[in-house]
Amino acid sequence: MALASSNATSMEELFGNPFRPKKERVVVEEKPFEYTPSAYVQMIDQMIGIKTRPWNPERTPIKPIQMLTLPEMSREERWIQWGMENCTVKASISGVLGVGVGFAFGLFTASVDPQLSMVGGDPTKQLTLKQTWKEMSSRMKSYGKNFGSIGLMFSGTECALETIRAKSDWRNGTYSGGIVGGLLGLRAGIMPAVWGAAGFAVFSTIIDHYMRG
């Protein structure tokens, strides 16, 4: 339209009345073109472009709208997840729980038959409160130490095997039971170590199969 107007004016100047006063031209200034990128272009430039981002001088990242996803984990939740995945933490927790189970088991057996491990005592006489407490404490310490060491060794070995193999299946429990049983039986000799490894491996496999089933 502007081109047609300019052509008409030029034709009038050429072939019009030369004595007629000339009309003043109205010059309309054109605004400079300003490019405003869309949200899609901004996202593409942020991901794979040159990342100039003149519309975002603070360089704040674009966060997608979460619709069907879980919210971000807090700092405390990340710490808990790290602790549950760390072999040292898992082994320590299993050891502490094993000590607690050993204490309870020792207390139960001592309350059922407190004279079971009394050596050199008269079984016909009734035990005093001091003797009963001594028997209970010694048995609780013994069971707690055994159960705690077994839980610590088994959980640590299983976590290490799971990390090395990068798999979480029943073989981790079987291998861990064999290793821990062999180490515990090795104190009595080679054959007890073999039988201990085999028995503990079978027991771990059965328990793992029951828990996973």
Swiss-Prot record:
Predominant place of localization: mitochondrion
A Gene Ontology cellular-component term: TIM22 mitochondrial import inner membrane insertion complex
Keywords: Membrane, Mitochondrion, Mitochondrion inner membrane, Protein transport, Translocation, Transmembrane, Transmembrane helix, Transport
Biological process annotations from GO: protein insertion into mitochondrial inner membrane
Entry's family note: Belongs to the Tim17/Tim22/Tim23 family.
PANTHER family the record matches: MITOCHONDRIAL IMPORT INNER MEMBRANE TRANSLOCASE SUBUNIT TIM22
The protein's name: Mitochondrial import inner membrane translocase subunit tim-22
